[in-house]
Design a protein with these regions (language model features):
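Mobile "lid/hinge" segments at catalytic clefts and subdomain interfaces of large enzymes
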Residues: 83-189
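Conserved nucleotide-binding/hydrolysis micro-motifs of P-loop NTPases
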Residues: 8-9, 60, 100, 136
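Short intrinsically disordered coil segments
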Residues: 17-20, 70, 108-109
Length: 189
């Protein structure tokens, strides 16, 4: 489970009147937690029964740099260097296409002006999540943006692996639950 907590003070505001407490996540917080969770979840062993929770708390935000990218990388580094068995790491990169040029991790203004924007999460070997906003962009433009993002992610994954090699803990082992085949056959019939 990924929890994305964006405190109001991170953007220079203090909640007033009705919403004095920051009890529930904002819509943006929910979407950011999904961007982090979607590529990470399939990389866990499906028989792992231990709850794993990553909490990303935004302490400062400047609206120009995508906080979900930094939070995604932080979550990936924390799980990869922990003792939790996981088939990561994963990296996330934004790429946009403006006027024939590709920009990696664009600013908010560049993203708004782009005719194609992709958010790609990938391991070293493969792409595991694609999120795209393409205003009738040609297929070749979108595919090139995906390729650039994946190549960038491969470099980031190498960096994460170097961190894990220095500070990573050995992964714990767990017993996989035995399947009761008689019960399974009864349920299927």
């Amino acid at each position: 489970t990924i929890e994305f907590e964006e405190r109001m003070y991170a953007v220079g505001r203090i909640p007033g009147s009705f919403n004095r407490r920051e009890g529930k996540p904002s819509e943006r917080g929910i979407l950011n937690s999904r961007i982090i969770d979607r590529p990470m979840r399939p990389l866990f062993d499906e028989e792992l029964r231990n709850d794993t929770v990553v909490t990303c708390t935004v302490l400062a935000n400047d609206y120009d740099n995508p906080v979900e990218i930094v939070a995604s990388l932080g979550a990936s580094i924390s799980i990869a260097s922990s003792d939790v068995p996981w088939n990561g790491p994963v990296a996330t990169t934004n790429v946009c296409h403006i006027g024939g040029e590709y920009i990696v991790n664009p600013s908010a203004d560049q993203r708004a002006a782009a005719d194609c924007f992709v958010c790609i999460a990938s391991t070293f070997e493969k792409v595991v999540m694609i999120e795209t906003e393409a205003n009738e962009a040609p297929e070749g433009v979108v595919l090139e943006a995906i390729r650039i993002a994946h190549e960038t992610n491969m470099e980031i994954v190498k960096f994460i692996n170097s961190i894990v090699a220095e500070i990573g803990k050995p992964k714990f082992t767990f017993e996989k639950a035995a399947v009761n085949h008689e019960l399974l056959d009864d349920l299927m019939n």
